[in-house]
Amino acid sequence: MAEGGFDPCECVCSHEHAMRRLINLLRQSQSYCTDTECLQELPGPSGDNGISVTMILVAWMVIALILFLLRPPNLRGSNLPGKPTSPHNGQDPPAPPVD
């Protein structure tokens, strides 16, 4: 506890708030559970969504692969056999003239 009897945790999660959540949970469970049976399908969104996270990740991977294959030649890193690797054809550059 902090000075003056003020508890900052009480602002975030109070006992009353926790009890309200518990009561709401019990009330919701009563809507799909009876004395004789409990339904397996809980109310809410079903698991058969149109687009899943896996499908989104696969789509991003396909887009990345396409962009990788279609990158410009100067970003590919390999030179064509007829082109020199540097302006000096692999030799050291000439020394600067001495004044």
From Swiss-Prot:
Gene Ontology CC entries for this record: endoplasmic reticulum; endoplasmic reticulum membrane
TM regions (residue ranges): 50-70
Pfam families per record: DUF2615
Membrane-side (Lumenal) residue stretches: 1-49
Record flagged with keyword Kinase: no
Chain ranges on the Cytoplasmic side, renumbered to this chain: 71-99
Membrane-protein topology: Single-pass membrane protein
InterPro entries: Uncharacterised_CD034/YQF4 (IPR020309)
Keywords: Endoplasmic reticulum, Membrane, Transmembrane, Transmembrane helix
Region spans: Disordered: 77-99
Keyword Hydrolase among record annotations: no
Compartments, as annotated in UniProt: Endoplasmic reticulum membrane
Protein name per its UniProtKB record: Small integral membrane protein 14
Organism: Pongo abelii (Sumatran orangutan)
